[in-house]
């Protein structure tokens, strides 16, 4: 993928405002809360995948991995193929959860009995519903759960889990952790993520994801909130995030650039 061209400082600032907000992080600094389970929702962002495995291993709690084969699974296949260590894992035709379970077991030495696999879900709503069903079947008492997801989908995922368990008297306490907070900056040869890391989105895909995410989070007729599709609980969108998103949508240089570069 060629380097993403230069963007204005104003546009970069708006991108990072939206991206930081979407990557909901309920922690400051190190994770000091002891959980009863870590849920890793299937995605293709290697630092996020590694973060979930690291937490589960350090806390010695079950790692519930959720993800079947969906419209974005090919991005995970690509990420694994390009990774210098994980590329030995077989991907073609396999569910996301099966692939991520191999990473957790083979590379993070998480015992098989501590890896719970949900390999039927194909979207965010099913990730939440099917994961909650597995938790309800667990012999262990699950009170506190750390949910880890692609940072661009982290806030929506949390709102989805809260919607699924809205009417449950003893629902777990959901805590959100995206693994890292994405940030774009102008580099000497174009725009890129800082700090650099393996297994991230292309800049084009990242921008497409974050600009497409806010309409889903709205609580209106077209959104996913209670007044729309009712997939998620109501989400308050801060004014600065809304303004930043509007700026990106009205930035013709950016939209033209994204349209000209196939994802």
Per-segment meaning from a language model:
Residues 239, 246-248, 252-263:
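Active-site cores that bind ATP or allylic diphosphates and position pyrophosphate for catalysis
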Residues 181-249:
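A conserved mid-domain beta-alpha-beta active-site/ligand-binding segment of alpha/beta enzyme cores
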Residues 1-200, 255-263:
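A structural signal for short, hydrophobic/glycine-enriched beta-strand patches
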Residues 23, 27, 105, 215, ...:
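Generic surface-pattern signal
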